[in-house]
Protein backbone atom coordinates (compact mmCIF):
# COMPACT_ATOMS: atom_id res chain seq x y z
CA UNK A 1 0.00 0.00 0.00
CA UNK A 2 3.02 2.30 -0.29
CA UNK A 3 2.70 2.98 -4.03
CA UNK A 4 1.28 6.19 -5.43
CA UNK A 5 1.67 7.94 -2.06
CA UNK A 6 2.21 11.31 -3.70
CA UNK A 7 -0.91 10.90 -5.81
CA UNK A 8 -2.92 9.94 -2.75
CA UNK A 9 -1.63 12.92 -0.80
CA UNK A 10 -2.45 15.25 -3.66
CA UNK A 11 -5.97 13.83 -3.84
CA UNK A 12 -6.50 14.30 -0.11
CA UNK A 13 -5.14 17.86 -0.31
CA UNK A 14 -7.62 18.71 -3.05
CA UNK A 15 -10.45 17.18 -1.04
CA UNK A 16 -9.70 19.31 2.00
CA UNK A 17 -8.61 22.51 0.29
CA UNK A 18 -11.80 22.58 -1.75
CA UNK A 19 -13.87 22.19 1.38
CA UNK A 20 -16.56 24.76 2.10
CA UNK A 21 -17.25 25.01 5.86
CA UNK A 22 -20.27 23.08 7.07
CA UNK A 23 -21.89 26.20 8.46
CA UNK A 24 -21.88 27.72 4.99
CA UNK A 25 -23.27 24.59 3.35
CA UNK A 26 -25.79 23.71 6.03
CA UNK A 27 -24.39 20.21 6.41
CA UNK A 28 -22.21 18.21 8.76
CA UNK A 29 -18.78 16.88 7.87
CA UNK A 30 -17.39 13.37 8.24
CA UNK A 31 -13.71 12.76 7.48
CA UNK A 32 -12.31 9.33 6.66
CA UNK A 33 -8.67 9.39 7.78
CA UNK A 34 -6.81 6.44 6.34
CA UNK A 35 -4.40 4.92 3.85
CA UNK A 36 -4.87 3.48 0.35
CA UNK A 37 -7.77 1.35 1.55
CA UNK A 38 -9.60 4.61 2.23
CA UNK A 39 -8.14 6.61 -0.66
CA UNK A 40 -9.55 4.04 -3.05
CA UNK A 41 -6.37 2.86 -4.74
CA UNK A 42 -7.24 1.45 -8.16
CA UNK A 43 -10.87 2.59 -8.22
CA UNK A 44 -12.61 5.83 -9.20
CA UNK A 45 -13.05 8.45 -6.45
CA UNK A 46 -16.82 7.95 -6.40
CA UNK A 47 -16.33 4.19 -5.94
CA UNK A 48 -14.25 4.38 -2.74
CA UNK A 49 -16.08 3.65 0.50
CA UNK A 50 -16.14 7.28 1.75
CA UNK A 51 -18.07 8.32 -1.38
CA UNK A 52 -20.34 5.31 -1.00
CA UNK A 53 -21.03 6.29 2.60
CA UNK A 54 -21.99 9.79 1.50
CA UNK A 55 -24.43 8.31 -1.01
CA UNK A 56 -25.94 6.16 1.75
CA UNK A 57 -26.27 9.17 4.03
CA UNK A 58 -28.12 11.08 1.33
CA UNK A 59 -30.47 8.17 0.71
CA UNK A 60 -31.19 7.97 4.44
CA UNK A 61 -31.99 11.69 4.59
CA UNK A 62 -28.80 12.93 6.30
CA UNK A 63 -27.00 16.07 5.14
CA UNK A 64 -23.37 15.12 5.67
CA UNK A 65 -20.40 15.55 3.39
CA UNK A 66 -17.82 12.76 3.63
CA UNK A 67 -14.27 13.91 2.93
CA UNK A 68 -11.81 11.27 1.79
CA UNK A 69 -8.55 11.91 3.66
CA UNK A 70 -6.93 8.66 2.62
CA UNK A 71 -3.25 8.75 1.62
CA UNK A 72 -1.66 5.72 -0.01
CA UNK A 73 1.13 4.25 2.10
CA UNK A 74 0.17 6.16 5.23
CA UNK A 75 0.82 4.80 8.71
CA UNK A 76 -0.51 5.76 12.12
CA UNK A 77 2.51 8.06 12.50
CA UNK A 78 1.62 9.79 9.24
CA UNK A 79 -2.00 10.05 10.30
CA UNK A 80 -0.96 11.70 13.54
CA UNK A 81 0.98 14.31 11.58
CA UNK A 82 -2.14 15.05 9.52
CA UNK A 83 -4.61 15.54 12.38
CA UNK A 84 -4.41 19.34 12.46
CA UNK A 85 -4.86 19.41 8.70
CA UNK A 86 -7.97 17.21 9.02
CA UNK A 87 -9.37 19.45 11.73
CA UNK A 88 -9.40 22.40 9.32
CA UNK A 89 -12.53 20.78 7.89
CA UNK A 90 -14.28 21.08 11.31
CA UNK A 91 -15.43 17.44 11.20
CA UNK A 92 -18.30 16.27 13.33
CA UNK A 93 -17.19 12.66 12.94
CA UNK A 94 -13.83 11.15 11.96
CA UNK A 95 -13.43 7.57 10.81
CA UNK A 96 -9.88 6.53 11.73
CA UNK A 97 -8.85 3.66 9.46
CA UNK A 98 -5.09 3.40 9.91
CA UNK A 99 -2.66 0.66 10.88
CA UNK A 100 -2.59 -1.63 7.86
CA UNK A 101 0.77 -0.29 6.68
CA UNK A 102 2.17 -0.39 10.22
CA UNK A 103 1.38 -4.08 10.23
CA UNK A 104 2.68 -4.83 6.74
CA UNK A 105 5.96 -3.17 7.72
CA UNK A 106 6.15 -5.10 10.98
CA UNK A 107 6.18 -1.94 13.07
CA UNK A 108 5.76 -2.02 16.82
CA UNK A 109 2.18 -2.54 18.03
CA UNK A 110 3.05 -0.42 21.07
CA UNK A 111 4.08 2.50 18.86
CA UNK A 112 0.97 2.04 16.74
CA UNK A 113 -1.20 2.15 19.85
CA UNK A 114 0.49 5.33 21.07
CA UNK A 115 -0.09 6.98 17.70
CA UNK A 116 -3.75 5.95 17.55
CA UNK A 117 -4.37 7.13 21.10
CA UNK A 118 -2.79 10.49 20.27
CA UNK A 119 -4.90 10.81 17.11
CA UNK A 120 -8.10 10.04 18.98
CA UNK A 121 -7.29 12.39 21.87
CA UNK A 122 -6.64 15.30 19.53
CA UNK A 123 -9.80 14.66 17.55
CA UNK A 124 -11.87 14.43 20.73
CA UNK A 125 -10.29 17.59 22.12
CA UNK A 126 -11.52 19.39 19.00
CA UNK A 127 -15.05 18.10 19.57
CA UNK A 128 -15.11 15.36 16.93
CA UNK A 129 -16.68 11.97 17.50
CA UNK A 130 -14.50 9.06 16.45
CA UNK A 131 -15.18 5.73 14.79
CA UNK A 132 -12.07 3.55 14.92
CA UNK A 133 -11.73 0.81 12.30
CA UNK A 134 -9.54 -2.14 13.19
CA UNK A 135 -7.03 -3.84 10.92
CA UNK A 136 -5.44 -7.28 10.72
CA UNK A 137 -2.19 -8.69 9.41
CA UNK A 138 -1.64 -12.00 7.61
CA UNK A 139 -0.95 -15.01 9.86
CA UNK A 140 2.53 -15.46 8.40
CA UNK A 141 3.66 -12.55 10.58
CA UNK A 142 3.57 -14.98 13.48
CA UNK A 143 1.06 -15.66 16.23
CA UNK A 144 2.64 -13.33 18.78
CA UNK A 145 2.79 -10.34 16.45
CA UNK A 146 -0.68 -10.84 14.97
CA UNK A 147 -2.21 -11.19 18.44
CA UNK A 148 -0.49 -8.06 19.75
CA UNK A 149 -1.36 -6.13 16.60
CA UNK A 150 -5.06 -6.99 16.61
CA UNK A 151 -5.37 -6.27 20.34
CA UNK A 152 -4.39 -2.64 19.81
CA UNK A 153 -7.67 -1.49 18.27
CA UNK A 154 -10.12 -2.67 20.96
CA UNK A 155 -7.69 -1.42 23.61
CA UNK A 156 -7.62 2.07 22.09
CA UNK A 157 -11.39 2.11 21.62
CA UNK A 158 -11.98 1.02 25.21
CA UNK A 159 -9.54 3.50 26.75
CA UNK A 160 -10.85 6.42 24.69
CA UNK A 161 -14.51 5.34 24.84
CA UNK A 162 -14.97 5.51 21.07
CA UNK A 163 -16.92 3.34 18.64
CA UNK A 164 -15.05 0.43 17.08
CA UNK A 165 -15.56 -1.48 13.87
CA UNK A 166 -13.40 -4.53 14.63
CA UNK A 167 -12.11 -5.02 11.07
CA UNK A 168 -12.41 -2.54 8.20
CA UNK A 169 -12.20 -5.31 5.58
CA UNK A 170 -14.79 -7.55 7.20
CA UNK A 171 -16.44 -9.54 4.43
CA UNK A 172 -13.89 -8.31 1.88
CA UNK A 173 -10.45 -9.59 2.87
CA UNK A 174 -9.31 -12.76 1.08
CA UNK A 175 -12.32 -12.77 -1.24
CA UNK A 176 -10.93 -12.65 -4.80
CA UNK A 177 -14.28 -11.44 -6.11
CA UNK A 178 -13.97 -8.25 -4.03
CA UNK A 179 -10.26 -7.53 -4.37
CA UNK A 180 -7.97 -6.34 -7.11
CA UNK A 181 -5.28 -8.71 -8.45
CA UNK A 182 -2.84 -7.66 -5.69
CA UNK A 183 -5.15 -9.29 -3.15
CA UNK A 184 -4.91 -6.23 -0.89
CA UNK A 185 -6.93 -3.39 -2.36
CA UNK A 186 -10.71 -3.75 -2.75
CA UNK A 187 -12.51 -3.39 -6.04
CA UNK A 188 -15.47 -1.05 -6.39
CA UNK A 189 -17.71 -3.90 -5.24
CA UNK A 190 -15.43 -4.43 -2.25
CA UNK A 191 -15.66 -0.77 -1.31
CA UNK A 192 -19.44 -1.03 -1.39
CA UNK A 193 -19.24 -3.91 1.08
CA UNK A 194 -17.00 -1.82 3.35
CA UNK A 195 -19.50 1.04 3.27
CA UNK A 196 -22.36 -1.33 4.03
CA UNK A 197 -20.48 -2.94 6.93
CA UNK A 198 -19.42 0.45 8.32
CA UNK A 199 -22.95 1.82 8.34
CA UNK A 200 -24.20 0.12 11.55
CA UNK A 201 -21.22 1.55 13.44
CA UNK A 202 -21.54 5.03 11.94
CA UNK A 203 -25.31 5.38 12.26
CA UNK A 204 -25.40 5.81 16.08
CA UNK A 205 -22.90 8.68 15.86
CA UNK A 206 -24.98 10.78 13.48
CA UNK A 207 -26.61 13.89 14.86
CA UNK A 208 -25.21 13.53 18.38
CA UNK A 209 -24.39 16.74 20.19
CA UNK A 210 -20.74 17.56 20.55
Residue positions per predicted region:
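Serine-esterase "nucleophile elbow" of acetyl-processing enzymes
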Residues: 23-72, 82-90
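N-terminal twin-arginine translocation
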Residues: 3-5, 19-23
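Bacterial N-terminal signal peptides
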Residues: 10-20
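Alpha-helical cap/lid subdomain in secreted, periplasmic
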Residues: 52-55, 59-62, 78-210
Amino acid sequence: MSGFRARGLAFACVALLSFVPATARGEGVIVALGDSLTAGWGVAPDEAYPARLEMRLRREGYTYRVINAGVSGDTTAGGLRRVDWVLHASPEIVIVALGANDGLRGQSPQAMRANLEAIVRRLQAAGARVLLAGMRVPPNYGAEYTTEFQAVFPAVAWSAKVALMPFLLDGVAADPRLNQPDGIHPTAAGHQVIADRLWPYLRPLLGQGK
